[in-house]
Swiss-Prot record:
GO cellular component: mitochondrial inner membrane; mitochondrial small ribosomal subunit; mitochondrion; small ribosomal subunit
Subunit architecture: Component of the mitochondrial small ribosomal subunit (mt-SSU). Mature yeast 74S mitochondrial ribosomes consist of a small (37S) and a large (54S) subunit. The 37S small subunit contains a 15S ribosomal RNA (15S mt-rRNA) and 34 different proteins. The 54S large subunit contains a 21S rRNA (21S mt-rRNA) and 46 different proteins.
Family assignment from sequence similarity: Belongs to the universal ribosomal protein uS10 family.
Listed name of the protein: Small ribosomal subunit protein uS10m
Gene Ontology annotations of biological process type: mitochondrial translation
Lineage, uppermost ranks: Eukaryota, Fungi, Dikarya, Ascomycota, Saccharomycotina
Pfam family, one: Ribosomal_S10
Localization annotation: Mitochondrion
Function in brief: Component of the mitochondrial ribosome (mitoribosome), a dedicated translation machinery responsible for the synthesis of mitochondrial genome-encoded proteins, including at least some of the essential transmembrane subunits of the mitochondrial respiratory chain. The mitoribosomes are attached to the mitochondrial inner membrane and translation products are cotranslationally integrated into the membrane.
Primary location: mitochondrion
Anything else known: Present with 8480 molecules/cell in log phase SD medium.
MF terms (GO), sorted A to Z: structural constituent of ribosome
NCBIfam families per the UniProt record, alphabetical: rpsJ_bact
Amino acid sequence: MLRNTIALRSFIRTQSTRPYPVNVEAVYYAPLKLPIKYGDLVADIQLRSYDNENLDFYSDFILRTGYYLGIPLTGPKPLPTRRERWTVIKSPFVHAKSKENFERHTHKRLIRAWDTNPEVLQMLIAYITKHSMAGVGMKCNFFQRSEISLDLGSDANGLEKSLSNIDELYSLRNDDKAQTSAVGQKVLELLDSPDFKKHLEKK
């Protein structure tokens, strides 16, 4: 059906003598794409359909929409086709020998968006969802980058104290007597701690 539509457009274009507007003239050519500048991947748009013609038509529509919104897009990249087969009996009788095979192909396309503001990307998704085609499914994965912050909170003091104790023991590694005394002192502190004593209490 898509090939017939393209052939009909080409026939009408050759028969017409009027100049077309630029946006209408662009329909007869491949969709334009903006170059990738920073290489920042922001979204993956995966399309699925049982009919590859509608899938290619909708992919073309997404590329044109992204171009006019200023979004660099790559694709559509054909993904492996999923093939499913079922064998069922023709007769309602359970021991029937005649069987029938059914097969279904799921075609997939992948379009990637780059170097785009999240607000503009949401506008693209909203627009192509509003004008979606019947029989074509869409799944979008968003990628966002944020800073990593380390917040130890109340455990920071305990961690610093433990590190200071370890440093103190390593500083005494050449003095056996001082090291033995330091270790014994730490053992006594642990034995006198309330957390350790509560386990020694008889119930």
